[in-house]
Regions:
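Noncatalytic carbohydrate-binding groove/subsite architecture in carbohydrate-active enzymes
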Residues: 43-47, 128-129, 133, 165-290
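Aromatic-rich peripheral "rim/lid" segments of glycoside hydrolase catalytic domains that contact
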Residues: 155, 279-373, 384-388, 403-427
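Substrate-binding cleft and catalytic face of glycoside hydrolase catalytic domains
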Residues: 56-200, 228-230
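Boundary/entry segment of secreted carbohydrate-active catalytic domains
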Residues: 24-60, 64-66
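Acidic (Asp/Glu)-rich catalytic clusters
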Residues: 25, 48-57, 92-105, 140-144, ...
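Secretory targeting and sorting signals
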Residues: 2-24
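Exposed aromatic-hydrophobic patches
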Residues: 396-403
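Conserved, mostly hydrophobic/aromatic
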Residues: 32, 61, 98, 139, ...
């Protein structure tokens, strides 16, 4: 009965996603996370990295502040960011630069110092329920302009939390941090969960984790999920497993329904890590560079249409050097620009098609305010303009109905950026 009910809820949510109803997240922000690239480069110049983010049109950056890095020794006054035991020097420069560039920041707190957990590694739970709360308070005082926070990362897998219990996560980490962050700044918004898309052999599924948090009376403003694809052939809107307990972008309606069921409609949804590895070089669920670019636009549209989704964060700006790890960036590890770079800055996707009438959606992300754009169609081997220059909405979005049959190739031109979107092939 539960599976049938979930299926009914899923179909209802899918209909809402397709229709783009009034509850769609039209105010959604799109961001990136790439801690290593932001902190160390290349390029060596932090200013150049900020310029790259501006060229991409990034609204927000997610960054992990490692508790064990800032507080390798126990502070005498843990709620005071100026306590001599705290060392914020790794994070101060880049966070201040992001603030000066008017790029919002989401801080994720992770990594227990050994003095909090009996000498274990950073993925072991601290023994004192007040410890993370005190650090969270200090972090908020250090960076008062930052008002969005997540507590831990993928605690449902042992790589990031031992023991991976939703009850202990809620009572020892989330709730103390939530109370402390609200005390430090009432404007702070705090997300819990930050779960991986599926359980590992020793882990907990995101569905079971959400329900365990509800039982433990979790305090949260938003539920955060990392909805990576987990199956070959999975796209942002198809190929996911509806009867399984995993949650990916393809099964996003499951997350929407589960969060509503357990925490109510006032709880928002943050999609805090997402991306597709490109191959070559990746061999793990990798897709071609062109398909990666297409999925960037399709994922942006899916999140835009989803109710209560406020954030979609792309994981990596630059591929990791080790091809067996993450290659989901907009640059290769050698610095070559991939098609996904322009696909992120100018996302473009198909909403629907009825005969030759095709509805397309997109966004011009760099800068703020209404942006000029033009559409092109490939005809007889040549790109032809579709009408004249138009303006996006004040938040950069466009939605057009064009005459385009299946197989037609379309793209967006941004005259201010002097570049094209990825090519959209009508399906």
């Amino acid at each position: 009965m539960r599976i049938r009910l979930a299926a009914i809820i899923g179909v209802s949510c899918l209909a809402l996603l397709a229709s783009g109803g009034v509850s769609a997240s039209s105010h959604i922000q799109y961001g990136v996370q790439d801690d290593a690239w932001l902190l160390y480069g290349p390029p060596a110049s932090p200013a150049a990295r900020i310029q790259t983010l501006q060229r991409l049109g990034v609204d927000l950056v997610r960054m992990t502040v490692r508790w064990d890095t800032v507080a390798s020794k126990a502070p005498a006054d843990p709620r005071n960011p100026a306590d001599p035991a705290y060392d914020w020097s790794l994070y101060d420069p880049i966070l201040q630069r992001l603030h000066a560039a008017h790029i919002d920041v989401l801080l994720s707190l992770w990594g227990a110092p050994s003095w909090t957990n009996g000498g274990h590694g950073p993925n072991y739970l601290p023994k004192d329920a007040a410890a993370l709360g005190s650090f969270a308070y200090a972090a908020s005082q250090r960076y008062p302009w930052i008002t969005r926070w997540t507590v831990w990362n993928e605690p449902n897998v042992r790589l990031f939390l031992i023991p991976n219990s939703p009850t202990l996560y809620t009572t020892r980490l989330l709730n103390p941090a939530y109370r402390a962050l609200k005390s430090a700044n009432p404007r702070n918004l705090v997300a819990g969960g930050v779960t991986s898309p599926r359980k590992t052999p020793s882990g907990v599924s995101p569905i079971a984790w959400i329900r365990g948090m509800r039982t433990a009376r979790a305090l949260l403003d938003a539920y955060a999920q990392n909805p990576y694809p987990v199956r070959p052939g999975e796209t942002p809107s198809s190929g996911g497993c509806w009867r399984c307990t995993e949650i990916t972008m393809a099964t996003l309606p499951k997350l929407i329904a589960e969060v509503k069921r357990d925490f109510g409609t006032r709880t928002r949804i943050w999609l805090t890590e997402y991306g597709y590895n490109s191959k070559p070089p990746s061999r793990w669920l990798g897709v071609s560079n062109l398909l990666q670019a297409r999925f960037v636009g399709e994922a942006a549209l899916r999140a835009y249409l989803a109710p209560r989704v406020d954030l979609l964060i792309h994981f990596l700006v630059r591929d990791e050097p080790n091809a067996s790890r993450w290659t989901s960036g907009f640059y290769t590890s050698r610095g070559k620009v991939k098609p996904s770079f322009n696909a992120y800055a100018l996302p473009f996707a198909q909403v629907s098609r009825r005969g030759n009438r095709t509805t397309v959606w997109g966004q011009v992300r760099p800068r703020t305010g209404a942006q000029p754009y033009r559409l092109q169609r490939l005809r007889a081997g040549h790109w032809r303009w579709i009408g004249g220059t138009r303006l996006t909405t004040r938040t950069g979005y466009l939605r057009r109905v064009v005459t385009a049959a299946r197989g037609t190739q379309l793209r967006v031109w941004s005259p201010r950026d002097r570049r094209y979107s990825a090519v959209l092939i009508v399906r």
